[in-house]
Amino acid sequence: MRIAASTVLFGAASAASFQQQAQHVLSGGFGKAQEAMKPISDAFTDAAGRPFESFEDAFSGMTAETKALWEEIKLLVPDSAFKDLSWLSKPKPHHRRDDWNHVVKGADVQGMWVQDANGKSHRQVDGRLEEYNLRVKAVDPSKLNVDSVKQYSGYLDDEANDKHLFYWFFESRNDPKNDPVILWLNGGPGCSSLTGLFLELGPSSIDKTLKVVNNDFSWNNNASVIFLDQPVNVGYSYSGSSVSNTVAAGKDVYALLTLFFHQFPEYAKQDFHIAGESYAGHYIPVFASEILAHKNRNINLKSVLIGNGLTDGLTQYEHYRPMACGEGGYPAVLGEAECRSMDNALPRCQSLINNCYESGSVWSCVPASIYCNNAMIGPYQRTGRNVYDIRGPCEDSSNLCYSGLGYISDYLNQQSVMDALGVEVSSYDSCNFDINRNFLFQGDWMQPFHRLVPKILEEIPVLIYAGDADYICNWLGNRAWTEALEWPGKKDFNAAKVKDLKLSGAEKEYGKVKASGNFTFMQVYQAGHMVPMDQPENSLDFLNRWLNGEWFAK
């Protein structure tokens, strides 16, 4: 399994130690923002398509103001890195299979028309689906023993663009005819959601002998769950092309869900929720907005949940220094000099992020990502502490601090497992660092996707939960952006009473919760970046209570 110690698995910046690892990383919005985000790779080639060999060559035609922003990067990235630039993920070896139980043609679904109550005809479901197909394999539970419930796996195909997204569905252990459906997304960007399946909240985990171990607190105890490897070239997904921004990924997810619920209408009538962590703080506002934008849809979206997410960088990056310096509920990791240095760097960082927010331009957003990650995450990371859990050191740098990732990768690379799931690629990787880099260099990292949340709140509830021991997407920053968000319910939300979170019958609380209208924030005690891994029973408790509408607007 190819993993670089400096790269973030679940959603922190791969540029956190950019100064030390720049060459390795480089080689190895909507509306105005969407228009401005042209591929930065275009700027690193001349008119004939040949790569430039230095910053001077690439940026000689820029204005003085733009050059000044990029001078920050010039100090961090060696010229030699430009000689090996590659902007497309290398396609994995793969072979197409033909042993599928179902194949759903997007063109057929798009061609279905219905009449409304007034006799007017319209498409049964909206969206451009003609280029998509969904392939479905009924997984034999006895082959893998991950769970005994009904399971499906397969691929969403975008044949025109050679994109193939892998998914794995687990039916609810309880009452699948009535229980809700959840789509789970890990972050990265570029990390497999099968990480969430086996390391956090799925029906089983993998031990060091590659044995499957049952999880009594799986999120499919009372809900059916879809785990999706997205964007393409992540996990078991593959493509000859690439996706390098969140908005493009949203189109694929809408198509997947539409075709899946068309094939399985018994699940389409259930409540549907999107949940994820880390960079899913970017994904989920965009994916939810994409779904809600379609009036005629078969996706019964009822809420979204974001755990330890990166959603509003301008607000969240201010809270790295307090978390590292003893103000987040845990002892300080950094000394006074380093804390002062982070304080000194913050105004420049916020200025760069604000420029990104206002322009949406890749030329503003990339410098913001690199400078801020180096200044705000780099000092902490250089201590050797776990960026996902402030309570201890990074114990397995070859697996991004968690040996369990290695076990999962070894398990999923077994041919018997791949055959049982209908996998078409030759290998599984937990994270694709080309994707991580491409999102960074498309300016996606600092895009203000939190601005989509107020519109979402008009239609469905939103839960932001955060393990309070995480550094990389810490609870201080997540609480801060929820309180800073401009929406009609802001005043009431900020004034809402903070209540204890407790298991039924327990005396001691496991966290705090604040809710008003459709907005809820939770702090979960003694949990790092991956709350379901660190607090499995407690996370299942708040999930079930959320699905039952405990904190929804009445």
UniProtKB/Swiss-Prot annotation:
It is found in: Vacuole. GO terms for molecular function: serine-type carboxypeptidase activity. Pfam families: Carbpep_Y_N, Peptidase_S10. Disulfide bonds join 191-431, 325-339, 349-372, 356-365, 394-401. It is an enzyme of class 3 (hydrolase). Its EC number is 3.4.16.5. Keywords: Carboxypeptidase, Disulfide bond, Glycoprotein, Hydrolase, Protease, Signal, Vacuole, Zymogen. Its main location: other. InterPro entries: AB_hydrolase_fold (IPR029058), Peptidase_S10 (IPR001563), Propeptide_carboxypepY (IPR008442), Ser_caboxypep_ser_AS (IPR018202). It comes from the Eukaryota. Residues 18-137 form a propeptide. It catalyses: Release of a C-terminal amino acid with broad specificity. Vacuolar carboxypeptidase involved in degradation of small peptides. Digests preferentially peptides containing an aliphatic or hydrophobic residue in P1' position, as well as methionine, leucine or phenylalanine in P1 position of ester substrate. Belongs to the peptidase S10 family. This is Carboxypeptidase Y homolog A. It comes from Chaetomium globosum (strain ATCC 6205 / CBS 148.51 / DSM 1962 / NBRC 6347 / NRRL 1970) (Soil fungus). The gene is CPYA.
